[in-house]
């Protein structure tokens, strides 16, 4: 038997939680989140509004307040999506029509919402959280489990976010988050990975 897991779940289970699992039995690759045709259709969205999409999941409310106050100071419009309080179609609609996003979440194993945003080719600033509290355990983690420099900017503190924001916004044209999705996260890529594992079992 083999188990398919994300890289961070593999690290947590095998090396940090002490589970008696043979690492050779675990295959690490992500689930697909979109088909290639739909992904390519997202490239047509060019005339985006000067607006920031904020995604907020299980973080201190003070973190959100700091970010919204910063955007207000810079006269940047924003739309907030709170985890569990939105329809997915509305998140996608906003992502396809916003210039950039700020993503704040607890650590994720794969992070489907983040990847759906990236599939809309919206550059993100991710305020990362690297510690995952699970029951009585303290595990390593990250807010963004799959990432590349094409996707945007990863920061560890609000101070860093504040310092980097202007330069990030001025250089949005340099980012192509959709490249990461094409390479790793389409349904077609997932099918190819599964087929390979079955053929080399």
What do these predicted regions represent?
Residues 1-25, 62-63:
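A short, active-site helix/loop in glycosyltransferases that binds the activated sugar's phosphate group
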Residues 9, 26-39, 132:
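Short beta-strand->alpha-helix junction loop in the catalytic core
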Residues 31-91:
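Conserved catalytic-core segment of nucleotide-activated headgroup transferases in glycan assembly
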Residues 93-98:
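Short alpha-helical donor nucleotide-sugar binding micro-motif in glycosyltransferases
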Residues 101-102:
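A short hydrophobic beta-strand element within the catalytic core of glycosyltransferases
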Residues 106:
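Aromatic "clamp/platform" in nucleotide-sugar-dependent glycosyltransferases that forms part
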Residues 110-184:
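Catalytic binding pocket for nucleotide-activated donors in carbohydrate/polymer assembly enzymes
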Residues 167, 183-201:
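C-terminal alpha-helical cap of glycosyltransferases
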